[in-house]
């Protein structure tokens, strides 16, 4: 009788654990999609202007970059929400499942655990979002071009090839960014004073600053891969895009033509890799997205816990 009860309790415990994992996954998806939709709408004019400034080699503040700030956005709002959600969803899942295992069972360091979260979130995000990103950037290339017309044009001109261009550069960029971002924000936040009470305004502000700083530095680190990615996306569907090495080699050759050897090169790379406007966009955008995701995730988790207390599962 005792053994039967023990087996029954074990199965119930395993079932409860499975349900909690499934519920947390649903919460992460909902939080991520909400974050992605909000941030994609908020920052779409900035993103489009940044892309056009790199593609057309003109000033970011040029009016031409902002002439149609929401071109193609309404036709692809779901895709944009997905693009902005994947990193946060994978990050949330890794923190719930991978992080405790690495820290509690394997006894790894905090930095290594954050490194694993970053490389997981970055690689999955890069692989899942690249094709949609390629379509999005193609949509931005001309006026009156929609998401679905871009898909048709890309397929007509290059079959499936245009949808996979930029994949390696995207994964390299997102992995570099993810590892740098997760490690730095963890190190910075660990230096902040901790309060036993509920998180106050000052702590939220400091968290935002840490996330912004970490994202800014991660953007600079991953900047060369992002430049190569942009050059690959800017290649017409009927042509083969340059490799990461070729894109970076070309920009290095261009830098040799600068009048001042050191300062001229630094200014040139700053403009090409958009260290400034691009860095500010990712720093603020990532911090805003992280705050929205964390708050939404926390609220939904609390709501689920309250429902369990009110209507416990039998």
Protein language model regions, located:
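Interfacial helix-start motif at the membrane-water boundary
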Residues: 66-81
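Flexible extramembrane linkers and terminal tails adjacent to transmembrane helices
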Residues: 1-34, 50-66, 89-161, 168, ...
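Alpha-helical transmembrane segments of multi-pass membrane proteins
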Residues: 38-51
């Amino acid at each position: 009788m005792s053994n039967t009860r023990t087996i029954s309790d074990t199965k119930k415990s395993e079932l409860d654990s499975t349900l909690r994992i499934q519920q947390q996954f649903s919460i992460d998806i909902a939080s991520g999609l909400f974050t992605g939709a909000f941030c994609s709408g908020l920052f779409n004019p900035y993103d489009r202007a940044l892309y056009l400034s790199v593609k057309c080699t003109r000033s970011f503040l040029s009016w031409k970059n902002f002439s149609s700030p929401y071109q193609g956005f309404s036709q692809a709002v779901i895709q944009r929400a997905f693009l902005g959600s994947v990193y946060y969803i994978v990050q949330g899942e890794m923190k719930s499942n991978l992080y405790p295992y690495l820290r509690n069972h394997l006894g790894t360091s905090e930095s290594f655990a954050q490194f694993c979260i970053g490389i997981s979130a970055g690689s999955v995000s890069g692989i899942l979002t690249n094709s949609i990103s390629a379509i999005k950037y193609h949509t931005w290339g001309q006026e009156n071009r929609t998401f679905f017309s871009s898909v048709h044009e890309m397929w007509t001109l290059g079959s499936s090839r245009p949808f996979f261009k930029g994949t390696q550069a995207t994964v390299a960029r997102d992995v570099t960014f993810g590892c740098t971002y997760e490690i730095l924000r963890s190190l910075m936040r660990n230096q902040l004073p901790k309060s036993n009470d509920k998180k106050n305004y000052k702590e939220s502000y400091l968290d935002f600053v840490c996330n912004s700083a970490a994202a800014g530095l991660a953007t600079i680190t991953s900047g060369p891969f992002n430049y190569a990615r942009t050059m690959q996306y800017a290649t017409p569907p009927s042509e083969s895009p340059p490799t990461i090495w070729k894109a970076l080699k070309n920009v290095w050759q261009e830098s040799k033509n600068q009048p001042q050897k050191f300062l001229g090169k630094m200014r040139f790379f700053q403009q090409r890799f958009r260290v400034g406007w691009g860095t500010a966009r990712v720093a603020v955008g990532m911090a805003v997205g992280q705050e929205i995701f964390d708050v939404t995730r926390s609220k939904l988790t609390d709501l689920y816990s309250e429902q369990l207390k009110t209507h416990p599962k039998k």
